[in-house]
Regions:
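Short alpha-helical
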Residues: 13-14, 42-43, 78
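Generic recognition of short, well-ordered alpha-helical segments
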Residues: 16-20, 46, 75
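Residue-level recognition of beta-strand->loop/alpha-helix junctions
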Residues: 35-39
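Local sequence-structure signature of Cys/Sec-based thiol-disulfide redox active-site neighborhoods
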Residues: 1-34
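Short Fe-S-cluster ligation motifs
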Residues: 41-57
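Non-catalytic, surface beta->alpha helical segment in thiol-disulfide oxidoreductase systems
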Residues: 57-58, 63-93
Length: 93
C-alpha cells in the first residue's frame, strides 16, 4: 500500500485540477500517490472519513500516512511536492 493517498470525487472540478499535480509529481519526481474515488465507492468514502476526522470535510483530500499530515482542497505544486516528500509545507495554502 502506498503511504500517499488522494481522495477525490469523479465530478469534482477541484479534484480534476489537483489530479493534474498528482500526475506531474509522479512523472517528475517518481512519487506515487494512491487515488481513491469516494463519491461512488462506499469503502473509499469510509476510509476518507476515518482519516479526515473532520479536518477537511470534503474533497480533494490528500493524506500522508508516514507523517499524518494532510492537504484540504487545492494547493500549489511546490507546496504539494513538499507535503509528498514529508517536508515542512503550508497546510493552510
Amino acid at each position: 500500500m502506498n503511504h500517499l493517498l488522494e481522495f477525490y470525487g469523479t465530478e469534482c472540478p477541484h479534484c480534476v485540477r489537483m489530479h493534474e499535480l498528482v500526475e506531474k509529481l509522479e512523472k517528475e519526481e517518481g512519487i506515487k500517490i494512491e487515488s481513491l474515488e469516494v463519491w461512488h465507492n462506499p469503502e473509499n468514502e469510509k476510509r476518507l472519513l476515518e482519516l479526515d476526522k473532520e479536518f477537511c470535510g470534503g474533497v480533494p483530500f490528500f493524506y500522508n500516512l508516514k507523517t499524518n499530515k494532510w492537504i484540504c482542497g487545492e494547493t500549489s505544486y511546490d507546496n504539494f511536492k513538499k507535503w509528498a516528500r514529508g517536508e515542512d509545507f503550508n497546510q493552510e495554502e
